[in-house]
């Protein structure tokens, strides 16, 4: 049973992310262990949904674990060099057989995901010789045999299929100009294709929850630099995963996400919720604070309106915001505005006021108020302000916990004192001395 209030709240939270992703390209690298049983069926249903939401999809699957299982069953030991599989002729043939079988399974699951709706549009799946490969050759004295690497991606042909509304399905295989077939590494291939298409997102669907920090906790968001630091302490596969992710980011991919594809709905949760469910890696930091500009005014007005209606903030007209936009800083998370604050200065005093500090109700637990306060304090120090005050009707305790002390109106600059007396709000006055 769907709880109506929860459904509405979640759908509203998802709306801006759905809008952001419509018409954008997503490349997914899929661990082959996810392409069987009920996990495959649920994944196919989610892929069908993403396609119908207007997201352009390229899916690339691996074959490593399938080949390892077959090698073990035949009494053979798989060999790897720098994390890449040495692919003999037998393994290549098995990879080709697996590619055909798993595509057929996925097609069936994709059709089954919309079969309950008589008028549901079809979700076409296409494959082709989009990838030209070459042999890796010899690494550290080891002949990699039929292990290959992408030589060229037919980007125009891929875009043609995506423009037509088709989902592109790529096996971990590529063909050379001499007519030979090579087994490709899924991690590297997905990153390479994502760069060629300048994809909005590259998603790696694995059997782990994401990238863990040294203390075992999940790293929810990482910059490329932070990810590389974690790679130094990670195991071989995680190190290769991070390396591929960073290569994609440096090649122009906007975001790389790593999540547990075995968790039901994980792809939807990662794409369409603010906090996601796995690890998200960007070239730069996710949360940023910047100077506001005129284009931010509608968003600032929408953010502070509920607080104005509750009497927590003083009403500010659009004209006021236009005239004072230079005082405002805004906090963004993943490109969305979640908070704002203003620093007011006074010509006759070495003090300033933090005003209009507001954080979106959807982000109250993110520590964004703390970040905005720290930003305003740094900004105030930078222009020589030694005292920062805040006027508050009901958040005085929050400021007191952060070093502000109760003060009298006599400590306000004269111009601010006049406003304080005339507006009738009788706000608490709090002051924090700023040490350089």
From Swiss-Prot:
One of its GO terms (cellular component) is cytoplasm. Residues 287-436 form the N-acetyltransferase domain. The keyword DNA repair does not apply. It is an enzyme of class 2 (transferase). It holds the Pfam family AA_kinase. One of its GO terms (molecular function) is L-glutamate N-acetyltransferase activity. GO terms for biological process: L-arginine biosynthetic process. Its EC number is 2.3.1.1. It comes from the Bacteria. The keyword Cytoplasm applies. Its main location: cytoplasm. It is found in: Cytoplasm. It catalyses: L-glutamate + acetyl-CoA = N-acetyl-L-glutamate + CoA + H(+). Pathway: Amino-acid biosynthesis; L-arginine biosynthesis; N(2)-acetyl-L-ornithine from L-glutamate: step 1/4. Keywords: Acyltransferase, Amino-acid biosynthesis, Arginine biosynthesis, Cytoplasm, Transferase. Belongs to the acetyltransferase family. ArgA subfamily. In bacteria which possess the bifunctional enzyme ornithine acetyltransferase/N-acetylglutamate synthase (ArgJ), ArgA fulfills an anaplerotic role. This is Amino-acid acetyltransferase. It comes from Neisseria meningitidis serogroup A / serotype 4A (strain DSM 15465 / Z2491).
């Amino acid at each position: 049973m769907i709880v109506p209030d929860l459904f509405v709240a979640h759908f509203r939270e998802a709306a801006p992310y759905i809008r952001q992703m419509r018409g954008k390209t997503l490349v997914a690298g899929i661990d082959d262990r996810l392409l069987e049983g009920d996990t495959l069926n649920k994944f196919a249903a989610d892929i069908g949904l993403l396609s119908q939401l207007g997201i352009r999809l390229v899916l690339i699957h691996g074959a490593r674990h399938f080949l390892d299982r077959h090698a073990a069953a035949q009494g053979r030991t798989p060999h790897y060099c720098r994390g890449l599989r040495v692919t003999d002729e037998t393994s290549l043939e098995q990879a080709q057989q697996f590619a055909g079988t798993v595509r057929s399974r996925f097609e069936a699951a994709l059709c089954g995901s919309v079969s309950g709706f008589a008028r549901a549009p079809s979700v076409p799946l296409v494959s082709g010789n989009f990838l030209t490969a070459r042999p890796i050759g010899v690494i550290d004295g080891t002949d990699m045999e039929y292990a290959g690497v992408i030589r060229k991606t037919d980007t125009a042909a891929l875009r043609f299929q995506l423009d037509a509304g088709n989902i592109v399905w790529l096996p971990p295989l590529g063909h050379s100009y001499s007519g030979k077939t090579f087994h490709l590494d899924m991690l590297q291939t997905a990153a390479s294709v994502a760069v060629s298409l300048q994809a909005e997102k590259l998603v790696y669907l694995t059997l782990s929850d994401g990238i863990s920090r040294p203390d075992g906790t999940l790293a929810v968001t990482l910059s490329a630099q932070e990810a590389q630091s974690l790679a130094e302490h990670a195991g071989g596969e995680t190190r290769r995963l991070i390396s591929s992710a960073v290569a994609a980011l440096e090649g122009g991919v906007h975001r790389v996400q790593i999540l547990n594809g075995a968790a039901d709905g994980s792809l939807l949760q990662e794409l369409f919720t603010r906090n996601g469910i796995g690890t998200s890696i960007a070239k730069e930091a996710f949360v940023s604070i910047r100077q506001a500009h005129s284009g931010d005014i509608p968003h600032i007005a929408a953010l502070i309106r509920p607080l104005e209606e509750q009497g927590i903030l003083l009403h500010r007209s659009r004209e006021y915001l236009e005239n004072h936009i230079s005082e405002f800083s805004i906090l963004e998370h993943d490109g969305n505005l979640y908070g704002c604050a203003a620093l007011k200065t006074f010509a006759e005093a070495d003090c300033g006021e933090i005003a209009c500090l507001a954080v979106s109700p959807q982000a109250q637990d993110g520590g964004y108020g703390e970040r905005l306060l720290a930003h305003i304090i740094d900004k105030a120090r930078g222009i020589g302000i030694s005292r920062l005050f805040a006027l508050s009707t009901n958040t005085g305790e929050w400021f007191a916990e952060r070093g502000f002390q109760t003060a009298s109106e006599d400590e306000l600059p004269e111009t601010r004192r006049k406003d304080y007396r005339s507006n009738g709000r009788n706000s608490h006055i709090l002051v924090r001395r700023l040490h350089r």
